[in-house]
């Protein structure tokens, strides 16, 4: 919001005037502030611009990456918590995995095979999210590939819902909407293309 900068500008110029700034100096300051304001507006415009391929604005990309950055240092725990909640809510999904079939969830979440699988999945998601700031076609390709990889397993979008739940307080409503608008859409597109 440019109004914060504009209020700062007025306040600083008043202070400088009270402390001896002359008319020529004030004109120079105003010229400098005009240039700063122009670049701030350009930067804000680029954050609001929507990428035609992903459908995400720069603000939405930043919201997703900020949230992910809060949990990125503990990806294994994010994966284990997400899959644990997913399997608790949808036991039939657990049965899709040969190594997980017939294992009680309480034991499964302590299993090295479970930890390895969740680490692979969340690492793939991590790489995909980091591609948000790369060329959009690469991001779209990665998301569609994730969707295609899971169609044969009968996977749906439930994983994303439980991922949001696992991220907890680090996810605000804006970020949830940003995830929902693009990630789920591209995963579903990948699933449809299979």
UniProtKB/Swiss-Prot annotation:
Superkingdom to which the source organism belongs: Eukaryota
Subunit structure: Artemia hemoglobin is a dimer of two similar sized subunits. Each subunit represents a globin chain which exists in two forms (alpha and beta), thus making possible three different phenotypes (HB1, alpha(2), HB2, alpha/beta, HB3, beta(2)). The globin chain is a polymer of eight heme-binding covalently linked domains.
Organismal lineage: Eukaryota, Metazoa, Ecdysozoa, Arthropoda, Crustacea
Globin domain residues: 1-45, 55-194
Residues reported in the UniProt entry to bind heme b: 150
InterPro entries: Globin, Globin-like_sf, Globin/Proto, Mb-like_M
GO molecular function: heme binding; metal ion binding; oxygen binding; oxygen carrier activity
Species the sequence originates in: Artemia sp. (Brine shrimp)
Swiss-Prot/TrEMBL keywords: Heme, Iron, Metal-binding, Oxygen transport, Transport
Full protein name: Extracellular globin-E1
Pfam families named in the record: Globin
Family as reported in the entry's similarity comment: Belongs to the globin family.
Signal peptide extent: none
Record's keyword annotation contains Heme: yes
């Amino acid at each position: 919001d440019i109004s914060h900068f504009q209020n700062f500008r007025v306040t600083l110029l008043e202070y400088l005037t009270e402390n001896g700034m002359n008319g020529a100096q004030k004109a120079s300051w105003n010229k400098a502030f005009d240039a700063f304001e122009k670049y701030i507006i350009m930067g804000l415009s680029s954050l609001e611009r929507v990428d035609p391929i992903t459908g995400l604005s720069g603000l939405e990309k930043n919201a997703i990456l900020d949230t992910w950055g809060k949990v990125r240092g503990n990806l294994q725990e994010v994966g284990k918590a997400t899959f644990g909640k997913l399997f608790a809510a949808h036991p039939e999904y657990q049965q899709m995995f040969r190594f997980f079939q017939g294992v009680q969830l309480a034991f499964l979440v302590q299993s090295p095979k479970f930890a390895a699988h969740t680490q692979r999945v969340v690492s793939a998601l991590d790489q995909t999210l980091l591609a948000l700031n790369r060329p959009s076609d690469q991001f779209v390709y990665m998301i569609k590939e994730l969707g295609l990889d899971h169609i044969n397993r009968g996977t749906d979008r439930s994983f994303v819902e439980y991922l949001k739940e696992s991220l907890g307080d680090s996810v605000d409503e804006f970020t949830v909407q940003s995830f929902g608008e693009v990630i789920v859409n591209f995963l579903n597109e990948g699933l449809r293309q299979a």
